[in-house]
Curated annotation (Swiss-Prot):
Region G5 motif, annotated ranges: 329-334
Ranges for region G4 motif: 270-277
SUPFAM superfamilies, per the entry: P-loop containing nucleoside triphosphate hydrolases, Transducin (alpha subunit), insertion domain
Entry protein name: Guanine nucleotide-binding protein subunit alpha-11
Binding residues for Mg(2+): S53, T186
Residues given in the record as GTP binding sites: 46-53, 180-183, 274-277, 331
Coiled-coil residue windows: none
Xref: PANTHER family: GTP-BINDING PROTEIN ALPHA SUBUNIT, GUANINE NUCLEOTIDE-BINDING PROTEIN SUBUNIT ALPHA-11
Outcome of mutating F341L: In HYPOC2; induces an increase in sensitivity to changes in extracellular calcium concentrations
GO molecular function: enzyme regulator activity; G protein activity; G protein-coupled receptor binding; G-protein beta/gamma-subunit complex binding; GTP binding; GTPase activity; metal ion binding
Enzyme Commission code: 3.6.5.-
Membrane topology according to the record: Lipid-anchor
Amino acid sequence: MTLESMMACCLSDEVKESKRINAEIEKQLRRDKRDARRELKLLLLGTGESGKSTFIKQMRIIHGAGYSEEDKRGFTKLVYQNIFTAMQAMIRAMETLKILYKYEQNKANALLIREVDVEKVTTFEHQYVSAIKTLWEDPGIQECYDRRREYQLSDSAKYYLTDVDRIATLGYLPTQQDVLRVRVPTTGIIEYPFDLENIIFRMVDVGGQRSERRKWIHCFENVTSIMFLVALSEYDQVLVESDNENRMEESKALFRTIITYPWFQNSSVILFLNKKDLLEDKILYSHLVDYFPEFDGPQRDAQAAREFILKMFVDLNPDSDKIIYSHFTCATDTENIRFVFAAVKDTILQLNLKEYNLV
């Protein structure tokens, strides 16, 4: 074989390979285009601690693989850390609010717990378990807990602190509810894709604290639906970042901004009025009218309170043609979220029938 014929042969092989690669790329591009058409992007928005991360966890439980024993074990130290964080917040608040411990020994217990570096906590040693239990039973700490709207305390504090014995047992494995209740502030952007009826739902959770919000801008392209979470129980609370600003007013301001963004002109808006269980407890002793004087409904009435809050948010919508879909939720209740998201999924699919060739 001559050198020329060998080169021609090699060249034709290269051309064939190049054509094959090009064909593969074209095929992949067509596939990507088709998949993009069958992908719904759901953007979870809301202020800090409104329940967005819990909602994502529920999607993993309801529509994903859930949490294996190994996954749950990964939450163990976070549960311990949440317990220390909650007790430290109350110990600091005892001083600020000038509440006294009823039992003298709790001054020493408070000192012991206060000295713990929460981020280094990986175990739950007996001396700390004993100190936390004794502190939680102190009438002074209970009074401090009752005044929690005056400082920052996680919604899960009572859930964990009343169950310290179970959590302190040897070989403790967090339950699904323990996992749902764990509070870890979201920094950055978390995406959770799941497949439903041959459609990919890509749920995007972004940090709700003010410092996190400037990162949102990158998520604003091709959003099918905005899912905006409001914590119903925050009507009497102040912001983590500013202790003279009402959390619900901040949530309203953010919602107004979001629904008037030009990016979201074609996105449907679904409003989740979350933490309805906490509202039902709180409304019995903390009156909505004290924080929102325009409320003229009955006191201690959760139904009247939540309908008023819903109307406040819906009234922020300047576009009379745009429907705000709304649901009252409890993000830690799997069955409630299963039911609500089934309705949300149907709404989203109905609104996107033509575009996604679902008719």
